[in-house]
Amino acid sequence: LPAKSIREAMRIYAAAPSATILWGMGVTQWGQGVDVVKGLSGLALSTGNLGRPNVGVGPVRGQNNVQGACDMGALPNMYPGYQSVTDPATLEKFAKAWGVPSLSGKVGYSLTDVPHKVKEGKIKANYVMGEDPLQTEPDLSMMREAFSELELLIVQDIFMTKTAAEADVIFPATSWGEHEGVYSAADRGFQRFEKAVEPQGDVKPDWEIISLMATALGYPMKYNNTKEIWDELRELCPLYYGATYEKMAGLGYIPWPCTTEDSPGTPWLYAGNKFDRPGGKGLLFASEWRAPMELVDEQYPLVLCTVREVGHYSCRSMTGNCSALQTLADE
């Protein structure tokens, strides 16, 4: 792509009265994804396309509620509400609420760290929930070899995935429509959803499985429903405090931050160009150019490009058992 074309595109973007940058997984799922996302965010910051209506940046995820998983602390360096695991005040607050003497301030491992840490003997067990890493992760040969060396693999899912087929223990979970809860949209909006049908067979909601597991291990969790869990979350997370179950039912949609019960939420962040940093200014990142890791060479002379299938969703983990869809996109 000529440099002239890139500059022309940037000038068009900068001159637009309002502009939004959305990116898919092609931007993020390669060796320089972090640098690219920082660059796109920097473009928005330097052109005034943050902090007002109809502008911004954001990823288009491969699944619903990826934002929700991050909001709830399913990250190696964050507790719920984006509170750092290395912050002493955060550790003290959560430890007191959860009735334990202390909590670890150590940053955990990312998903791509897992096979390497298994090889190093630092991970001996893996508890996989709603994920199919033996079907979807990069360098599957390494991932499968690492999983074969685990002393224990637990999978909690709604289908018998490739990963579940290798598990030592399987916990069958309810699927969408069989339980209630809250989703987060990509624009930080909380959306409450209701159970539509009773689950069939010996399956349980994710939260109940976790509660039973914790209780069996000596840490009793006595939640009766998702509202009790949500209210505990609100008390511990200032960003979410005002997003009550009752208000979500009435408004249908509450974007965080929502810090008080009379607030409708925050439709856009950084109003007035005030950022959550010392001095209130945004931070621009500079990334040095480096050649992509995914270039062909003598050892790997071919590039495999995968595409989306019309008849299946994503990696077939959820749709591969449907015979009608298999006829549309069979190998």
Task: Give the positions of each predicted feature.
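Predominant activation on well-ordered alpha-helical scaffold segments within soluble catalytic domains
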Residues: R7, V37-A44, T112-P115, R144, ...
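Conserved thiamine diphosphate
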Residues: L1, A196-E198, A216
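Long, well-ordered, tryptophan-enriched scaffold segments
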Residues: L1-A16
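A cross-kingdom feature strongest in bacterial/archaeal respiratory oxidoreductases
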Residues: S46, Y79-P80, P88-D202, D231-E331
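Acidic catalytic cores of enzymes that act on phosphate-bearing nucleotides/polynucleotides
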Residues: P17-K119
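Acidic/polar loop patches that form or flank catalytic/metal-binding clefts of enzymes
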Residues: T20-I21, N49-P59, V155-Q156, P172, ...
